[in-house]
């Protein structure tokens, strides 16, 4: 089996899994979704471990088990942001390393806050997704695998709109000329791209600082940097963006903000310039890097280093997923301004 054939089989399996998960979530009564639980992917529990998440996980695992059997290749599923893994199928030879976030944004569909018997508090904004990323078969140790080794990625929109204004279910596939990103719909597949605009002052930036305040994982100064970054980005008169957006559950917003179509007679481009994330986690990075690259974008850390060469063993970092090289350079300059001036200047 060629790499292209294998990658296609993997992407198709992930699309089927994501769409079945979407159906499961919408079919489950809201009052049943939020029961606290533990699962293979979330063995420690926590506010993101809910009954709906565990049920969706079972769906995803079943699809991965069938995929491993059909390909005759083992799958090593990353757990706990790469600190552990769960083997699926064969245990010998090269294996596919995979990441699966069955509901990116669990609390949006399962409820947030103290539980009550007669009510559930949902976000109701539709902003969640099922996300997957896969390497081609490899024997490399987990810690040495680079983000760019994840050649296949799929993000399935949790609430696709009836009248699509943006690419919804998206996938990245490897190719001889590099990755390519596609929208998958009932009408077939279409290439999707980031914007060609280089005018940051006419584009939106999504700034995610949620994890800058995570005391277990943040770096010293992340909290202050996040405030300074907002000040640097929102100032559209001196090199900032047109405006700054925020959405919890980044992967559901990736296609909505960054991707559009380049089809005659008129290209429909996104107004999104970039995602800027302080202290991003691996389950978000692994699908985002190939999807952004395949659409013509650029993914770097806050020091300008390409994310594609970053190894799993290096863990979290702060990132920029930019529409193009020019936008990336402008945003790196904003990062430097935030670092040098501090939050209140």
Describe these PLM feature segments.
Residues 2-5, 9, 44, 48, ...:
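Alpha-helix capping and helix-coil boundary motifs
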């Amino acid at each position: 089996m060629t790499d292209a054939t294998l990658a296609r089989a993997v992407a198709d399996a992930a699309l089927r899994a994501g769409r079945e998960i979407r159906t499961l979530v919408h079919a489950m009564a809201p009052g049943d979704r939020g029961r606290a639980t533990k699962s293979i992917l979330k063995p420690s529990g926590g506010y993101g471990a809910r009954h709906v998440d565990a049920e969706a996980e079972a769906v995803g695992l079943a699809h991965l088990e069938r995929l491993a059997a059909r390909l005759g290749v083992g799958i090593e599923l990353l757990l706990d942001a790469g600190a552990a893994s769960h083997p699926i199928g064969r245990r010998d030879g090269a294996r596919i390393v995979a990441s699966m976030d069955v509901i990116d944004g669990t609390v949006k569909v399962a409820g947030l806050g103290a539980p009550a018997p007669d009510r559930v508090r949902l976000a109701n904004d539709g902003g969640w997704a099922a996300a997957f990323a896969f390497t081609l078969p490899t024997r490399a140790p987990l810690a040495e695998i680079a983000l760019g080794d994840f050649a296949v990625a799929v993000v399935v929109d949790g609430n696709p709109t009836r009248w699509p204004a943006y690419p919804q279910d998206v996938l990245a596939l490897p190719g001889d000329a590099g990755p390519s990103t596609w929208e998958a719909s009932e009408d077939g597949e279409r290439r999707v791209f980031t914007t060609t605009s280089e005018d940051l002052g006419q584009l939106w930036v999504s700034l995610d600082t949620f994890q800058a305040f995570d005391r277990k994982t943040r770096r010293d100064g992340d909290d202050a940097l996040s405030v300074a970054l907002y000040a640097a980005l929102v100032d559209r008169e001196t090199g900032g963006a047109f405006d700054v957006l925020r959405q919890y559950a980044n992967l559901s917003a990736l296609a909505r903000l960054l991707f559009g179509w380049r089809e005659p007679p008129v290209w429909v481009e996104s107004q999104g310039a970039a995602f800027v994330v302080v202290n991003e986690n691996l389950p978000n990075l692994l699908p985002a890097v190939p999807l952004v690259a395949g659409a013509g974008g650029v993914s770097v850390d806050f020091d300008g280093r390409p994310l594609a060469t970053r190894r799993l063993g290096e863990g979290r970092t702060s990132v920029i997923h930019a529409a193009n090289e020019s936008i990336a350079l402008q945003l790196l300059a904003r990062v430097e301004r935030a670092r040098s001036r501090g939050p209140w200047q």
